[in-house]
Amino acid sequence: MAKTLSKSSGGALAPWLGISLIVILFDQLTKIAVLKTFAYGAMHQLTPFFNLTLIYNRGAAFGFLATAGGWQRWAFTALGIGATLVICYLLKRHGHQRLFSLSLALILGGALGNVIDRLIYGHVIDFLDFHVGAWHWPAFNLADSAITVGAVLLIYDELRRVRGAR
């Protein structure tokens, strides 16, 4: 049986929104620090496989649709806002499901962190650059990391739930 935060059919929304707010805060603070420290495209090697850099992503994950002409800014902003509404609804209904709600809170914080970038700058600020030799993974940020961790936890929670139903 799932651990609960409350006895009601739903759960408290505030703790999950608090987690999302923490994600947004750390995401935005790191982006501001990078913007104040680095010139566009500049790279600072921290380890043989990790750099800090400043990249503008006008598209979505991995630069998808980055050169589409500008409409994608508003499409991805609308998608992020739509995801926010759906996630808030799910958190309100299922807030007592801790792992499910944690995963959604991380995804929500990450999505809103990138929506804020699109609204303020017209693009997303990416700065984490992992590489092996000359091969570089696409640069990303803390919001992207929160979305990824949230998605992995969401899959894990669903697999655990399905396995428990057998």
UniProtKB/Swiss-Prot annotation:
Catalytic-site annotation from UniProt: 126, 144
Regions that span the bilayer: 10-30, 46-66, 71-91, 100-120, 135-155
Pathway annotation from the record: Protein modification; lipoprotein biosynthesis (signal peptide cleavage)
Official protein name in the record: Lipoprotein signal peptidase
Any GO molecular function: aspartic-type endopeptidase activity
Family that this chain belongs to: Belongs to the peptidase A8 family.
Protein localization: Cell inner membrane
Cellular component annotations (GO), alphabetically ordered: plasma membrane
Xref: PROSITE patterns: SPASE_II
Function, in words: This protein specifically catalyzes the removal of signal peptides from prolipoproteins.
Native source species: Burkholderia thailandensis (strain ATCC 700388 / DSM 13276 / CCUG 48851 / CIP 106301 / E264)
Reactions listed under catalytic activity: Release of signal peptides from bacterial membrane prolipoproteins. Hydrolyzes -Xaa-Yaa-Zaa-|-(S,diacylglyceryl)Cys-, in which Xaa is hydrophobic (preferably Leu), and Yaa (Ala or Ser) and Zaa (Gly or Ala) have small, neutral side chains
Main location: membrane
GO BP term, example: proteolysis
Membrane disposition: Multi-pass membrane protein
EC number(s) recorded for this UniProt protein: 3.4.23.36
Keywords: Aspartyl protease, Cell inner membrane, Cell membrane, Hydrolase, Membrane, Protease, Transmembrane, Transmembrane helix
Lineage per the UniProt record: Bacteria, Pseudomonadati, Pseudomonadota, Betaproteobacteria, Burkholderiales
